[in-house]
């Protein structure tokens, strides 16, 4: 049993996956914090949930006082990132520092790097994103690591690719894919489905963030979390159809259609910025993490089976 006081900001798919990983490892004093103070599902007995405004450093400090580690897994709607994400991160960072919490772990993605012309995505790439969401991610990562270097709080960042899994709906491999597969209909994706594309299983993401929190060597850096083997998107979807016992049917949206959809759907408009992910090989390298902490990502077959089961029981 681990009685450390642990705080998780955000009760979405990632925050809940961190919660699951903590419970698996015997942690007990776990608190989720989101704005309404309500959970989307029944929580384990080791976990409680509180309401809180992550943009308010004073409120954050009051909520996290006495914590051993804080996980930042909160985020606004996809189309609100540039306006609303930095204030959330700033509020959590300043509140954690004010309260004297020793460790802060941030669940991040890969947008800050921008296009890589098909070359592997690794941690030493420059922050070259030109789109607004990529720039937002870069600015937040810099602020967090600057705080670490200044000795204000120990910070570690875990970065994932496009993720999928139980509870994940608004994703490139989410609710436009798995419900259709279960019904034998065409899964809707984007770009060239015959290019390799690394996908992260959200449970592996949560476990990796907990591992970072437990290792002093993790702090002061950004790490790419472990992923199962990189497949083409077609191979990934064909595997999902096979597991579901259905015949593969894939519908891929092109860039022009995505732009047209963006005139009416805010999320589609924002996806145009990261079109490069689906129009060139997108292979993520997690070898530094594997060398430092070991890597045992869930095989896609097992992860997809668990994901399909979650969607099957959703309604």
Regions found by a protein language model. Name each.
Residues 108, 142-167:
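Conserved beta-loop-beta element that borders a ligand/cofactor-binding pocket
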Residues 179-200, 211-212, 216-217:
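A conserved pocket-lining segment of Rossmann-fold NAD(P)-dependent short-chain dehydrogenase/reductase
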Residues 132-133, 161-171, 191-203, 227-229:
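Glycine-rich "substrate-gating" loop/helix at the edge of Rossmann-like oxidoreductase active sites
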Residues 6, 36-98:
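NAD(P)H-binding glycine-rich loop region in Rossmannoid oxidoreductase-like domains
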Residues 5, 211-271, 286, 291, ...:
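Mid/C-terminal beta-alpha module of Rossmann-like enzyme folds, strongest
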Residues 79, 110-120, 163-169:
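Conserved catalytic-site region of short-chain dehydrogenase/reductase
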Residues 14:
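Hydrophobic/small residue at the entry helix of a nucleotide-binding pocket
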Residues 90-139:
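Conserved Rossmann-fold NAD(P)-dependent oxidoreductase catalytic core, especially the SDR/UDP-sugar
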């Amino acid at each position: 049993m681990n009685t450390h006081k642990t705080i998780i900001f955000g009760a979405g798919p990632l925050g809940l996956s961190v919660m699951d990983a903590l419970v698996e490892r015997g942690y007990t004093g776990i608190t989720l914090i989101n704005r309404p103070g309500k959970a989307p599902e029944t929580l384990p007995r080791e976990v409680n949930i509180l309401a809180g405004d992550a943009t308010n450093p004073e409120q954050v400090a009051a909520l996290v006082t006495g914590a051993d580690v804080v996980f930042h897994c909160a985020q606004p709607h996809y189309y609100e990132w540039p306006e609303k994400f930095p204030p959330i991160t700033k509020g959590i960072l300043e509140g954690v520092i004010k309260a004297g919490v020793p460790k802060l772990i941030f669940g991040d993605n890969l947008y800050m790097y921008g296009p890589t012309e098909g070359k592997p995505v690794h941690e030493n790439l420059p922050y070259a994103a030109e789109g607004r969401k990529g720039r937002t991610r870069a600015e937040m990562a810099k602020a967090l690591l600057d705080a670490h270097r200044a000795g204000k709080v120990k910070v570690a960042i875990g970065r994932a690719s496009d993720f999928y899994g139980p509870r994940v709906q608004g994703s490139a491999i989410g609710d436009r894919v798995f419900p259709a597969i279960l019904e034998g209909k065409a899964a809707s994706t984007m770009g060239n489905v015959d290019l390799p594309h690394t996908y992260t299983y959200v449970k592996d993401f949560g476990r990796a963030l907990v591992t970072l929190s437990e290792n002093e060597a993790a702090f002061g850096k950004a790490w790419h979390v472990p992923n199962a083997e990189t497949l083409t998107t077609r191979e990934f979807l064909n595997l999902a159809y096979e597991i579901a016992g259905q015949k593969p049917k894939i519908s891929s949206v092109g860039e022009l259609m995505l732009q047209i959809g963006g005139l009416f759907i805010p999320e589609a408009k924002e996806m145009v910025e990261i079109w490069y992910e689906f129009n060139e090989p997108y292979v993520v390298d997690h070898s530094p993490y594997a060398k430092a902490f070991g890597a045992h990502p869930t095989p896609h077959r097992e992860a997809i089976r668990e994901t399909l089961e979650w969607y099957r029981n959703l309604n």
